[in-house]
Regions:
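Nucleotide/phosphate-binding catalytic cleft detector across ATP-hydrolyzing
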Residues: 1-159, 167-287, 293-339
Length: 339
């Protein structure tokens, strides 16, 4: 691009759980979406992984905040500070001036006008001069190599931290979709409640996340099961330390209700799909992206329930970010970008 040195172009997957920034076709930031703030001065102390390590361990003068909840901005000031701080981390060489920034940011397909405005304002206040937005399922489709402008129907199920985005895409647009607030964070919360009620142990968000990653499963029978996982915490009745061993079968059981909600949402979108596009989807299968796609056995469970093949995308965690990066390079070409 002419005078590209005057403009810094960034693609941002502003996620509830993680934020990924792409610059010059490379992932330059991939950090948890969390900040640590000094309560007395309101100054930023840490962002990303450093702030995540403080989460649940702070004293009264330090507060950790996750700026996004259920896929949308819940704390405007914290979101702005996080975006600004993450952009500062990008090493683009020494500059004598602050470049004008062009940003493409992805948003949930079910976002209201107020929620879209909040994302735009946060990005602009953090230094974005030219801000575009793209719906997450469209970004996910681009990120896994789908030509979204053909008349062929493709279905994306993107299970992020805050929302599960389900969409049928054809001819450069979203034909039908549903965005539900049952996703990775909900799985983590399910595990915390299960441990509380079933094992009378209190565990934090980070420990529940570790359980989800280590022994999380959508099926109670796996061909290649993970080893059981041991977690430590206080007994809810006595406050004495206890050790509990968790199996993948238990986690499959405790996640069942949330997974049924996702299955029902997929069925709802399929019911809304025009017959010709439905036939394309049955032939091509349904694509799974997002961190939730990594849940063991999820593709098999969904195929068993819905009777359509499901494919876990290559590198599902970064599909949305990569698609946002592709959109950044095609701003003039893609009419589905939101100004």
């Amino acid at each position: 691009m002419a005078f590209s040195f005057l403009t810094q172009e960034l693609a941002m997957d502003l996620g509830t759980a993680n934020t990924v920034i792409i610059h010059n076709d490379k992932i330059v930031v991939d950090d948890p979406s969390i900040v640590a703030i000094d309560q007395n001065t309101n100054q930023l102390i840490a962002i990303g992984e450093k702030a995540r390590q403080m989460h649940g361990k702070t004293h009264e003068n330090i507060k950790t905040i996750r700026p996004l909840r259920d896929g949308v901005i819940a704390d405007f000031n914290a979101a702005e500070q996080m975006i600004r701080g993450m952009i500062k981390q990008i090493n683009t060489g020494s500059r004598w001036f602050t470049p004008s920034r062009r940003l493409v940011v992805c948003i949930p397909s079910g976002s209201t006008e107020v929620e879209i405005r909040a994302v735009r304002d946060s990005a602009e206040h953090a230094g974005g001069r030219d801000v575009y937005m793209i719906y997450e399922p469209m970004a996910a489709a681009l990120g896994i190599g789908i030509d979204v402008e053909t008349p062929e129907g493709n279905m994306i199920v993107d299970i992020g931290g805050g929302t599960t985005e389900i969409a049928v895409i054809a001819l450069g647009g979203i034909v039908c979709n549903q965005s539900i607030r049952t996703a990775g964070d909900g799985f983590t919360s399910d595990i915390q409640q299960y441990m509380r009620h079933q094992h009378t142990i209190k565990i934090g968000e980070r420990s529940a996340e570790d359980i989800k990653i280590t022994v999380g499963s959508a099926l109670s029978e796996l061909e290649d099961p993970p080893a059981s996982y041991t977690v430590h915490g206080p007994n809810l009745m006595t406050a004495l330390p206890v050790e509990v061993t968790v199996t993948y079968q238990e986690i499959a059981h405790c996640l069942d209700k949330s997974l049924v909600k996702i299955e029902n949402a997929i069925m709802t979108v399929l019911e809304q799909t025009p017959p010709e596009l439905y036939a394309d989807i049955v032939r091509r299968g349904i694509f799974l992206t997002g961190g939730g796609a990594l849940l063991r056995g999820l593709d098999k469970r969904l195929k068993g329930k819905i009777n359509i093949p499901f494919q876990v995308a290559e590198d599902p965690l970064h599909a949305v970010a990569r698609g946002t990066g592709i959109a950044l390079k095609n701003i003039g070409k893609f009419p589905f970008l939101i100004r």
